[in-house]
UniProtKB/Swiss-Prot annotation:
GO terms for biological process: ribosomal small subunit biogenesis; rRNA processing; translation. It comes from Encephalitozoon cuniculi (strain GB-M1) (Microsporidian parasite). One of its GO terms (cellular component) is nucleolus. Involved in nucleolar processing of pre-18S ribosomal RNA and ribosome assembly. This is Small ribosomal subunit protein uS4.
Amino acid sequence: MAGKKGSKRASTPRDPFEKERLIREAQLVGVYGLKNKHELWVMEKIFAKDKERARILLTSTNPEDIPINGRSLLRRLMKYGILGGIDLCDKQEVVNGLNKVLDLTINHYLERRLQFRVFAAGLAKSVHHARLLIGGRCISIKDQIVDVPGFMVRADKEPLIEYNPYSRYGDKGKKKAEAKVGEE
């Protein structure tokens, strides 16, 4: 029995040949080392949903919406390190935080991908090299191998990004390779 059909992860642009958008997308794909524009469109959909949610909350007439739903949105963005330094107990700071969400750009979201975090941590020479390391299962987050370049890294897990200990870059993998050379 087949399962339910999931919702689309990405939405395609309305005008496929808009020159400014094509140039901007090509630059983002190159800077962040994305495989194709579909990966960019997935992140843009997440970004647009968060922005729309913040806009709806700010214009809501129900006074209970901002404290409850606004805090949950801001808590999630703070968890991923997209926003920071917001006191969720103060209602005015929550409103200010929702205004900050409207000021975010797609770059804030793309920088939280594992591929860019590996490059930013200095484990790879470029974002393209980072993608190869991740696909080759050479990167782990706290002893958990992650082989998805689009994995969104939480702010508390960022310092735990390291080489997989059993890969050729990790400590145990290097010892294993040295033992093989010694046997020959």
